[in-house]
């Protein structure tokens, strides 16, 4: 699975669970040579919450380097959370990790937990493989979908 496939799962999950999801197309160069920057990967609506989602995917348990997360992406997620609050917003940074067989986990940091991610990025503190193995803030991909209601409860 690639990161784009992971984002397809997120979008499909939103659309199939009485919500709305849209994958923002990847950045492209314009005719004038300017590059657009996507604010994050997916947006949508679920259970009266605006959903803003940035995804990263690891094909196996390994360290996650925050160089893969752009400053503007985490800043945009935090800004939306600050403007809307957790009662109307689900701003998510997610790292999917394939643990093999039928064990594909989606580690979730949402809303006020995004400050921890921003701090770790600023301090260049990777999420280590061993740390992933001990985290409990995840949902599993089941039958090609993520249970969005389960994410709201995390």
What kind of feature is each model-predicted range?
Residues 1-36, 154:
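Acidic-basic catalytic patches of nuclease active cores, encompassing PD-(D/E)XK
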Residues 30, 60-63, 101:
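Short, solvent-exposed loop/turn segments at secondary-structure junctions
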Residues 33-45:
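N-terminal interaction modules that seed assembly of large macromolecular complexes
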Residues 42-44, 49-60:
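Conserved catalytic cores of phosphodiester-cleaving nucleases, focusing on short active-site segments
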Residues 58-80:
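Mg2+/Mn2+-dependent nuclease catalytic core
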Residues 78-116:
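Nucleic-acid nuclease catalytic cores
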Residues 116-127:
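Acidic, Ser/Thr-rich peripheral helices and adjacent loops at domain boundaries
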Residues 129-154:
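Charged phosphate-binding loop/patch that engages nucleotide di/tri-phosphates or the phosphate backbone
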């Amino acid at each position: 699975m690639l990161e784009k496939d992971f984002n397809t799962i997120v979008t499909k999950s939103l659309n199939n669970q009485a919500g709305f999801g849209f994958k923002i197309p990847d950045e492209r160069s314009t005719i004038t040579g300017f590059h657009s920057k996507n604010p994050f990967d997916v947006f949508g609506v679920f259970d009266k919450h605006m959903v803003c989602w940035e995804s990263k995917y690891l094909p196996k348990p390994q360290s996650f380097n925050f160089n893969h997360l752009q400053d503007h992406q985490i800043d945009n997620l935090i800004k939306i959370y600050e403007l809307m609050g957790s009662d109307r917003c689900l701003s998510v940074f997610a790292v999917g990790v394939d643990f093999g067989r039928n064990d594909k986990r989606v580690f979730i940091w949402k809303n006020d937990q995004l400050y921890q991610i921003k701090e770790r990025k600023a301090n260049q503190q990777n999420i280590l493989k061993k740390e992933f193995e001990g985290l409990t803030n995840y949902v599993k991909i089941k039958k090609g979908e993520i249970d969005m209601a389960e994410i709201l409860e995390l």
